[in-house]
Amino acid sequence: MNKKVYVANLPFQASEPELKVLFSRAGDVMSVKIVADRQTGQPRGIAFVEMSTQWEARRAVSMLNRTDFMGKNLLVKEAIVRRGFRGR
C-alpha cells in the first residue's frame, strides 16, 4: 500500500483544512487535494489524502471508511497510483 488514500462521497461544501483535521486522527497528514471539475471548477466529491507513512494510510482507511462526515458516509480506500497518467 502506498501513502495516499482515495476519498469518495465527499460533501461538496467540504474544505481541504476540514479533511486534514479529520484525517489527522489517523496520523500525520502530508497533503490534501480535493478534485474539482476542470471546466466548472466545482468540487467533484472526491479527494486524495497523503499520509506520512504507509501504516498511517492503512490506519486512515480502517478508521475512516464509512465514517459520517458532514452528513455523508465517506468511502476511504487505498489510492491506485497510475504511472504516466497526465489527465485529459
Q: What kind of region is each of these model predictions?
A:
Residues 1-26, 30-44, 50-88:
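Intrinsically disordered, low-complexity RNA-binding regions enriched in Gly/Arg/Ser/Tyr
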